[in-house]
């Protein structure tokens, strides 16, 4: 069973930045290449599947991030019960994995989400990463996978 518990219960505040963990929520990795796969995701989630690099889409309950031409990251806006999380995962598994359109992997207990707020966020992120964040400063919902020296962060979502 997935572990939705978190060891982090603290928020750190500094003069120009605030760091906190987002309460554990549903996170699912989706992989597939066919047009049928992309269409099925949109239909099952009632969300437009982003197909362009560095984009995301959302509805009132879910967010879907483009990670690569054949990979997406789905997460819930709010904490949802284990019963609802299992229902959504099983629904996607039955409609995608069972019919061999792609893969559905629940990564809720593998990844954490950290909320960074403040006036110097882009400067902080740019300090250890070669990615140019200037194009993202005015873009809502932009995403990018980034690497920091010996640490790989799967995705940064800017909202």
What are the roles of these predicted feature ranges?
Residues 1-59:
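Acidic, proline/glycine-enriched N-terminal capping motif
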Residues 41-56, 122-147:
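Internal amphipathic helical hairpin motif
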Residues 149-155:
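Conserved small/polar residues in nucleotide/adenosyl-binding loops
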Residues 18-37, 107-128:
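Short glycine-/aliphatic-rich beta-strand segments at the starts of folded cytosolic domains
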Residues 99-108:
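Conserved short beta-strand edge segments in small beta-sheet-based binding/regulatory domains
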Residues 42-73, 80-96:
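A glycine-rich, hydrophobic loop/mini-helix early in the fold
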Residues 77-82, 119-121:
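Helix N-cap motif at beta-to-alpha junctions
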